[in-house]
Amino acid sequence: MRSSDQVGEGQKYALTSDEDDSDFWGFAHEAEGLFTPLPDGEGARRVHLAGCLPTGGLLQSVGHVGSRRATAGNAWLGLLDGDGVTMGSYFVGEVTVVDVQPSARDAGLVDLTLTLWCDNALPGADRVWEWVRAGQLNHTGKWHDLSPDGKRAWLSVALWARTYRQQAKPDAPAGQVFTVDGRHIVDEDSFYCAIGEAINGPGGYFGWNLDALDDCLLDGWGATTPFTLHWESSTEARAQLTERIPAGDDEAALFDLIVEILEARGVNVSLR
């Protein structure tokens, strides 16, 4: 979905009111600080919108810095590809203009400093979004060398960018065989990275916690049950996924619980 017919070259972000999707707040070239939590809270952000042309509700707040009317409200901050199509978006709350300066990028543009709340924009996700924008998620395994936090950020982008990247691609029909490579599964998040790519290809999403994995097995997320999952290097993965997880009145190792969830939804898990 294109954010606006007025998108220009280099504009990577678009703001739209949460209360009225016809209230478009404008484009920006950069949103520095969006992925950097402030010390006083995981979701608190101070964001520098560089090269911004504010409109609508945001424009109304620009002239009231320092007063209550500087708070524009809640919005959706979309991330745009090179053609101005929305790749994904974050809900941002209590968007407040705290500074306005002329922009060096172009006459008529301003640089806005905003305070807002956004706990879904995880640190490190900006790097993954740039890979999506540049079309660099064209082979599997790009997540292998990411830190634990980086893998979590990877999964978040895989989820938020799913609709854009799949482009209404239908689920694989029932009876398919998928192969998950267990060599790089060292913790729970790396399992989700691996199975996401096994089902949906490079940068694919197929859950990022146990409940989400179970939801994805209900169809609509890339694969139709029943299907077969060949789990390569499963012995190595089992040795890593040893965390004890509550399961009913008892608890189970994470590896065993994952297999149980898969099999309960009709997946034939072949451990190799």
Residue positions per predicted region:
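Phosphate/adenylate-binding glycine loop and adjacent helical scaffold
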Residues: 1-4, 17-146
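Helix-rich interaction surfaces within compact, conserved domain-sized segments
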Residues: 239-272
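Conserved helix-adjacent loop modules within structured domains
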Residues: 106, 179-228, 241-242, 249
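Extended, compositionally biased accessory segments flanking or bridging domains
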Residues: 2-25, 138-197
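A generic structural signal for short, non-catalytic loop/turn and secondary-structure boundary residues
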Residues: 107, 170-173, 222-224, 262-264
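Hydrophobic, Leu/Ile/Phe/Ala-enriched alpha-helical segments that form helix-helix packing faces
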Residues: 62-66, 164, 168, 195-199, ...
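Short, glycine-/small-residue-enriched flexible loop/hinge segments at domain edges that mediate gating
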Residues: 227-236
